[in-house]
């Protein structure tokens, strides 16, 4: 089973393909998408990154065994299982057919139509109208194919469904309003069936379909464009004027700034996004440096080094401890699927890593398991309400604030951080644990 790290930027629909595939196959995929671990536009241009991934593109996957692969479809294929890839030569060929169709037929018109509504690309009326007609053709083609089928290939979800759904995602979210999509009931049924599968929801969350077709906003587009400073012209000195014309031209040529590197569509999307406000900016400075504890936890012995460091430096006024327990243990069946619930939550909380740490454990066996963990948050309240992006999963858990000075808390922190102990409050053996750091 594949295991490794996926480098990407936040909310990259191309990365969703591999992450959803991993939900089905059970592949263990860690995501690095935000500083300090990964800074898109910088990290992926470093010599170290380019040695592994010469194209400098993301998503890029580095296996725990050192195997490296880029291109989203290749990564999704690698982390999949036989069922997703197509269990017969004929099914496998059809999966490749739809994956190729998504890239060649869906991406171009979808980008032409959707990107201007996001302020990423300038609007061209004729190009947009052509793209709309092309999208109609594609949805109609899918509608005919799905008239007698639940999924694109065979009777179960495959990479074909995962890839095409992810490619259509922004169309359904941004421009396919009810009056436009109603002509394609079979495509809509299939799309809704897929996005409501637990494995899709674990990565995509709740997908809200477009209610009103988004339009190009010229002001938003103008604001998204990088502003260039125009140097002020100054009168040249007498000596400057006396220089030979050819010499002055050479100096100007030498002083001319290097042309800006052309941004790809993903970088343009990031540049277009307004800088997010730090949800924790209102809190006073704390003496507890979470990153330093994380380094101790990752590189030193937990019981003899990391835990003593934690309690010695923990700032109970600037940080808080919480115990979380999954509300619906009766719904947990296969342990690998239960583990994927934890992984999916961690992935959606990626931007919270700088201000949180957690150890979450899956206890028990198939059809008899539970999930609980200990969390460390900046501030005295739960962090999830501070950002809509963090609110997908937390209501599925009960949360209890812990007293850092109590013996119970000391025991919980020791057992959950080390994955060792009696866990008397659980009544089940440790199956496996996950660390959010």
Curated annotation (Swiss-Prot):
Region (Disordered): 221-268
Domain (EF-1-gamma C-terminal) ranges: 276-437
GO BP, sorted A to Z: response to virus
Domain GST N-terminal: 2-87
Chain positions of cross-link Glycyl lysine isopeptide (Lys-Gly) (interchain with G-Cter in SUMO2): 285
Biased composition (Basic and acidic residues): 221-254
GO cellular component: endoplasmic reticulum
Keywords assigned by UniProt, alphabetized: Acetylation, Elongation factor, Isopeptide bond, Protein biosynthesis, Ubl conjugation
Protein name per the record: Elongation factor 1-gamma
Gene transcribed to yield this protein: Eef1g
